[in-house]
From Swiss-Prot:
Protein family per UniProt: Belongs to the tryptophan dimethylallyltransferase family.
Protein name per the record: Prenyltransferase nanD
Organism: Aspergillus nanangensis
Lineage, broadest ranks: Eukaryota, Fungi, Dikarya, Ascomycota, Pezizomycotina
Pathway info: Secondary metabolite biosynthesis
GO BP terms: alkaloid metabolic process
Gene assigned in the entry: nanD
MF term (GO), any: prenyltransferase activity
Residues holding dimethylallyl diphosphate: 114, 202, 204, 280, 282, 364, 429, 433
Length: 435
């Protein structure tokens, strides 16, 4: 730790200790960027990524430098123009700072970092040359391959064909809509999971536009895509069970989707060999209540085994402590912004792996609009009770360190969502999504 030499006014002067230099500080001295937008994505996001890496359970100092350099060299150039008030903007569905959302995973084996981003083109901002932001996803994955990141490109290509807009479909939408005024035009996002020095890639795809053109509900397009990719029928049982449930909760026609309070919003999958891949179907529910959590957690009573019900009991405890405001949310018109009240709905995902008979569920609790520190103190107490002693002791101070220049007793937008899942083997598994 460096020491700032004190001015010796008297013998009682106490040395002042400077903050220890971090990998972010060191890299900031030597990294240069091609424009102010890239510079801003480094200045605004990299400090938090650096702190999350420092807090992670399995990142050596060398791996911290590795992941920050990868972000600077291979992710920032893909993020497009940084959002500036008064300039034409593009609504990334993630709702973080610009086109990226960091998140922190908590499990008994330790904490780890993930970030999700939408590769964004200048043409998507203007709404002219790339109105649905379709082209940058190919560039992003090509860049990752050149950088040595391993993933399954064939799975991406298969899903792209099934869910993303073709040139003809994009042109058809442009002929009938004022595209720049459309709230959400996203096609795909990429998530990068950091495991020590390794990186794994997930793909998120948004079905709304293509499903509308095909005149089928979102959930039907998503399940059809999984079935098309699943040539050997390894996901047949789980997708059939999920379809049976979704038919009871989601609209069955495109016309009904405009007023639906529950519907599928996107799907995700690991870009690995199909035998190891997990498909996840995400839905939201505008009715925020624990009764709705019970319905979706158990798939309307279809999931009623001991592990499912044990997880539900722990989730109930967490829900009661957090005191998330209940009620019906308005339809989502834009990502959350600083100063918003509790506007976000509940989210759930249903995970399916090859050979699974039934999906596994994860719940996402909306925290936007609630002061940060009360949430942090409740989470710290929860961590202590459920086998996360280090996180229980440190989380409040750690969160303050993530956002050192803000009054977290008042600020309400940084801890945006808390996801929760449960298994007999690992116990609670949680992720906090930071905006």
């Amino acid at each position: 730790m460096a020491i700032i030499e004190p001015q010796m006014e008297n013998q009682n002067t106490i040395p002042i200790y400077a903050r220890e230099e971090t990998p972010y500080d060191t890299l900031s001295k030597v990294l240069t960027f091609s424009n102010i937008d890239q510079e801003e994505y480094w200045r605004r996001i990299a400090p938090l990524l650096g702190k999350l890496l420092q807090q992670g359970s399995n990142y050596t100092i060398h791996q911290q430098y590795q992941h920050l350099c990868f972000y600077a060299l291979h992710v920032i150039p893909l993020l497009g123009p940084f959002p500036v008030e008064g300039r034409s903007s593009y609504n990334c569905p993630l709702g973080g700072v610009g086109a990226i959302e960091p998140s922190q995973n908590f499990q008994k084996s330790g904490t780890s970092l993930r970030y999700t981003f939408e590769p964004t083109s200048t043409g998507a901002i203007s709404g002219r040359s790339d109105p649905f932001n379709r082209f940058m996803i190919d560039d992003a994955l090509s860049r990752f391959r050149q950088a040595g990141v391993r993933f399954n490109p064939h799975l991406y290509e298969a899903l792209k064909k099934e869910v993303l807009l073709t040139d003809e479909e994009a042109e058809a939408i442009c002929q009938h809509h004022d595209v720049p005024k459309m709230e959400f035009r996203a096609q795909a996002c990429i998530a990068v999971d950091l495991d020590g020095g390794n990186m794994s890639v997930k793909l998120y795809v948004y079905p709304m536009l293509k499903a509308t053109l095909l005149n089928i509900p979102n959930w039907e397009l998503c399940l059809n895509a999984i079935r098309h990719v699943d040539g050997e029928g390894q996901f047949t049982s789980a997708t059939a069970a999920l379809e049976t449930y979704l038919r009871t909760q989601c609209p069955t026609t495109v016309r009904e989707q405009t007023s639906a309070t529950t519907q599928v919003s996107y799907i995700a999958c690991d870009l690995v060999d199909l035998q190891r891949a997990r498909f996840k179907v995400y839905l939201f529910d505008l009715h925020v209540s624990f009764e709705r959590i019970i319905t979706h957690w158990t798939m309307g009573g279809r999931l009623n085994d001991e592990v499912t019900m044990s997880g539900l009991g722990i989730l109930r405890e967490l829900w009661d402590e957090l005191k998330i405001p209940e009620g019906r949310r308005k339809p989502i018109e834009r990502p959350p912004k600083p100063g918003d009240g509790p506007t976000m709905p509940l989210f759930f995902n249903y995970e399916m792996k090859a050979g699974d008979r039934l999906p596994k569920v994860k719940a996402y609790l909306p925290l936007v609009g609630m002061p940060e520190m009360p949430i942090a103190r409740k989470l710290a107490a929860f961590f202590q009770r459920y086998g996360f002693p280090v996180e229980g002791r440190q989380y409040v101070d750690t969160l303050a360190g993530y956002f050192p220049d803000e009054d977290l007793e008042i600020v309400t937008h940084h801890q945006a969502f808390l996801s929760f899942s449960y298994s007999a083997k690992t116990g609670p598994y949680m992720t906090i999504y930071y905006h």
